[in-house]
Amino acid sequence: TPKVVVREGDHVNAGDALFANKACPDVKFASPVSGIVTAIERGERRKVLCVKVKADAVQTSTDFGKKNVETMDGAAVKQALLEAGLFGYINQLPYAVSTTPDTTPKAIFVSALRDMPLAGDFEVELAGNEEAFQAGLTALSKIAKTYLGVGVDQQSAALSNAKNVELNVFDGPCPAGNVGVQVNNIDPVNKGEVVWTVDPSAVIFFGRLFLTGKVNLHKVIAVAGSEIKTPGYADVLVGTPLSAIVGEQLKQTEHVRLIEGNPLTGKKTTQEAYLGGHTSEITAIPEGDDNEEMLGWIMPRTNDFS
């Protein structure tokens, strides 16, 4: 449950906390931009829906100081991620929930293979971020043994030559890239045990923090689906309005289902929503609610199920 730690009218820098885990206040979530907090929107039972920040024309970031991950220990890595509001990007199994700093994982898993429907290739995002990705992997390896899962067709040297991790190559159909499937095949979670899972985009976020001392939540996502004019990739910032990403790309605005994620496991959303920190693709497909055939599926037919 999030607890908002800012008020409307406050000025925040990129990297300053917007909200924290109510059950574990040390786990904070960083603002992706510097600017003025314009609104804190709540839903039923005062559930926090979003914190809106109007970005400054000139961005400023809180400086947490550059760090040499090679000389850090696990406790120092945890503390750095907590201070910068990035620790919340780590999930734990079982239950796939955000973890806490007092949890001791037996292993950490990162899957760089994205094989869900219409998913983008992580190597596109990795290009130009190789140093940050390796720094993030090294930092995680200080906490626990770290496994990196890659696809048999992925060619990036930053993946195949990754250091301080155990590399596992997966070949097969979806869900071979699912991190839970990889955990089950490599180091299953037994009773009383916990493993951490980290999205590869978050690994880059971690690496940037240690290399530059600043929070940088830029990422590359896939914009796909049959209702997108030109499917491709978009370099965006976490928290960007979806209207700015797909607004001009949609073939039509009615009878379209916009999905944050992939068609199988993503969630239905709207253009008024914002890009989530764990989102790697935005999908637009037909809603299927514009069929006005009399009696619908009851009618006998030869080219469709009835």
Residues covered by each model-derived region:
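Buried, small/hydrophobic-residue-enriched core segments of structured protein domains
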Residues: 27, 41-306
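Short, well-structured beta-strand-loop connectors
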Residues: 6-20, 39
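Short boundary/loop segments of OB/S1/cold-shock single-stranded nucleic-acid-binding domains
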Residues: 20-26
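Short beta-strand/helix segments in adaptor/scaffold domains that form protein-protein interfaces
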Residues: 34-37, 47
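Short coil-to-beta-strand transition motifs
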Residues: 26-34
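Acidic, low-complexity mobile loops and tails
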Residues: 1-3
